[in-house]
Amino acid sequence: MSLDFKKTLNMPSTKFDMKANLVEKEPLFRKKWLEDDIYQKVLKNNANNERFVVHDGPPYANGDIHVGHALNKILKDIIVRYKSLQGYYSPFVPGWDTHGLPIEHKMLTESKLDRDQITVELLRKKSRNYALKQIEHQKKQFQKLQLFSDFSKIYITLDKSYEAKQLKVFKKLALDGLVYKGLKPIYWSPSSQSALAEAEVEYETVTTNSIYVSFDVTKSTFNKVPVGSKLVVWTTTPWTLIANAAVAISFDITYLTVKYQDSLYVVAKNLFYNDLLEKFQWENYEVVDEFLGKEMPRNSIWYKAPLLDFDAPVIATNYVLEDSGTGLVHSAPLFGEDDFSLTFDNDLKLIMHISDTGHIENSQTKYDSLFYEEANKEIIKDLAEKVVHVYTYSHSYPHDWRTKKPIIYRATPQWFVSIDKVRSKIVSELQNKVKTFPEWSKNRMISMIENRGDWTISRQRTWGVPIIIFYDENEKPVINEEIFDHVIDLVANHGTDIWFSSTVDELLPEKYRNRNWTKENDIMDVWFDSGVSSIAVDIDGGKTTLPFDVYLEGNDQFRGWFNSSVINAVAYAGVSPYINLVSHGFALDGQGKKMSKSRNNVVDPLDVIKKYGADILRLWVANSEYSSDVHISESILVQNSEIYRKIRNTVKFLLGNLNNFKYDKDLKLTSIHHYINEELKSVKKEVLENYDKFRFINVIKVLNRYVIDLSSFYFSVTKDILYIRKENDEERQMVLKNFYEILDFLMLALAPIIPTTADEMYSYFNKENKKESLFLERLEKAGDVSFDEKVLEQFKEFFELRDQVNILIENQIQNKVIKRSNELELVLPETASEFLKSLDLKTLLMVSKISYGKTLQVVKFESEKCKRCWNHFASLNKEYEICDLCFSVLKDTLANA
């Protein structure tokens, strides 16, 4: 009789395709999630549970999203999906930052007009419309990342409700005495014609002409520096010499008076011997005198200002260092913080000779109308007789992060938030209430707060939230709660445009009108806009308030959004806005280089999605050590595609075998199947703990290792049980129970990272009480998972034996004694443990016979091969040439054949 034995096997069967086709499937799943309202259903299901909210730092509403955006949003989405699966109430409200110079500048460029040629109202209208269009553009791009949000609720910093809440924060800070107007040097961008905050400054290496120039002493009552001596200073900004008003020395530095070519020069001793002698190339010099800075009496030395006709003092301070220069510092009070500090106790001249555009004006010199950089050359030329040395100097110099042009320190009247009054409270919140990942970043954040100066919040621009301050008839700022509230109500109803389109009296409460008051024209720093988001964003009708569970942004935000947010939140509400502060690095190319169009190394996330699908991009994010800079390239994406393929192949195998399986939670597992189940729990706990620590790379490592181990052992040794035995065989049911629980866990564990694939897997999963989507299921919490360590420990003995046996088998195959392990007989030492003897080693080690002898060895088994299971036996059923097991399985079939 002829029987096709292959048709009698329980072969895997599933319609789950090995080919992912993510590019085609992802839009379909996105559509399904939206139509089925999955996100809202999850929120509703979890509404009364413990909350865990990731607060979105708003990207700027301008241009296409880049790979840095993708990295950031995917990291957040992994957390939101994970916590939602665990039953937490985790609404995610995406935000956009919409004010500021880039949009304003773009509108001016498109209009082909200067600021003074376009009305404020028109410029703001154009800026608003552009920002709203950009939000819609970016929203569509973000949706392609398969984010767990339906984008029905977003926050935008130009919304009038947001602006009104922002002004409430400003009001409280002003009433609490934290806001003040003052003259002090701040970062000024001539290219933007505006003040900048620290977070708006980036540094580039530049090469400039640096000079050592001497100032002639005109008066002296300090005999160690006689009249006629020359004070040598070093500067990289010759244009500031016009505003020179003092020379600063240190109390604690030792100075020399050195005679060279009939002139006396004053320099710091250590710098003279260690640096200046070589630079100046002086020979035949003579040290005439030596003194400590503190020995110089106050107001004892005066010198002629280098470019203007007045005498200026030498002042001893505690901020001058001996690490570079000459130990004597040229001080222009309106162009440097330390320089400005000299004005507090000294009656110094305050000279402002630089216009908003960076041109010299009202300087009483011939340099008027020159741009400050152009003036440098002329000044060096004109001071030739006083210049001791000139050289080119490469150094890091601040630039405007938007225009990429150099900036300067320049004192102008600005509005500030005082940090000193809230500094200790902020530091306390960071130290005691905030967890950071990576851990070292807490010290970085604390250090920034401890060392930062007051926050310049005013900007001399048009597109932004106004500083709602009025000035009385004496030009003094009016800080009045009633007036603040009145204006804030106007903004809540009409938006901030009303500040610019209305007269002063139209903005004031009636009783304050007709007083000849004026209003402030400056707008707020955009970091103040985004920095109030923890207070201004309405997540769910006011139920969710700060502190939020997670802030997650690039590590450039330590001086940006992380900084402005904690200042505003502590000043307004007395608490940190975040509980967990997570930072990531920048996305670089495969060689670790910054991406740029000029290098032709830009990786566009939308191109990656078009080629590989968003799940591969998301897998790359999860599989990156994001706490540092991350690399992305074609080869790296291919590597992640391989991991994805292994996972998909594993799931296909599981689904195929689980076809028609009915899960029985009460089925007791024994032997290796019990071990596999305990191992699953161990892996589950490890994965969940790494999710909780935001260590997604470890999640991927653990899961990847797990599926490889499953394929190499459990899947291999159970194939005969699955394929050969009767469908309802008890041990076969044990294997399938494990498969079911393994697959159930894998889908849920992978869902935060590769949501489309995970939900696709779920759609093929045979499960009672199945939900519309995997994301309506529940994932356990790490604390609820336990496993029997004794079982895992006990089986170590078996796996040590397996490693030894595999080496012996491999030798037999390489020596061409056998082709497959099931052609061998395994001889175990008679001293083998009772535990090993209790196991079905024939199945677990995939050999044909187990016997016992003096030593561990494998020998070729003289046998016959079963035509159905292909295993080897001493003898077979003569009629059908099959083994006893196969015969028992087919008994009824053969009888009826």
UniProtKB/Swiss-Prot annotation:
Zn(2+) binds at C866, C869, C883, C886. GO terms for cellular component: cytosol. GO terms for biological process: isoleucyl-tRNA aminoacylation. It is found in: Cytoplasm. Transmembrane segments: none annotated. It catalyses: tRNA(Ile) + L-isoleucine + ATP = L-isoleucyl-tRNA(Ile) + AMP + diphosphate. Keywords: Aminoacyl-tRNA synthetase, ATP-binding, Cytoplasm, Ligase, Metal-binding, Nucleotide-binding, Protein biosynthesis, Zinc. Its EC number is 6.1.1.5. Its main location: cytoplasm. A motif ('KMSKS' region) lies at residues 594-598. A motif ('HIGH' region) lies at residues 59-69. Its cofactor is Zn(2+). Binds 1 zinc ion per subunit. It comes from the Bacteria. Pfam families: Anticodon_1, tRNA-synt_1, zf-FPG_IleRS. L-isoleucyl-5'-AMP binds at E553. ATP binds at K597. Monomer. Belongs to the class-I aminoacyl-tRNA synthetase family. IleS type 1 subfamily. IleRS has two distinct active sites: one for aminoacylation and one for editing. The misactivated valine is translocated from the active site to the editing site, which sterically excludes the correctly activated isoleucine. The single editing site contains two valyl binding pockets, one specific for each substrate (Val-AMP or Val-tRNA(Ile)). Catalyzes the attachment of isoleucine to tRNA(Ile). As IleRS can inadvertently accommodate and process structurally similar amino acids such as valine, to avoid such errors it has two additional distinct tRNA(Ile)-dependent editing activities. One activity is designated as 'pretransfer' editing and involves the hydrolysis of activated Val-AMP. The other activity is designated 'posttransfer' editing and involves deacylation of mischarged Val-tRNA(Ile). This is Isoleucine--tRNA ligase. It comes from Mycoplasmopsis synoviae (strain 53).
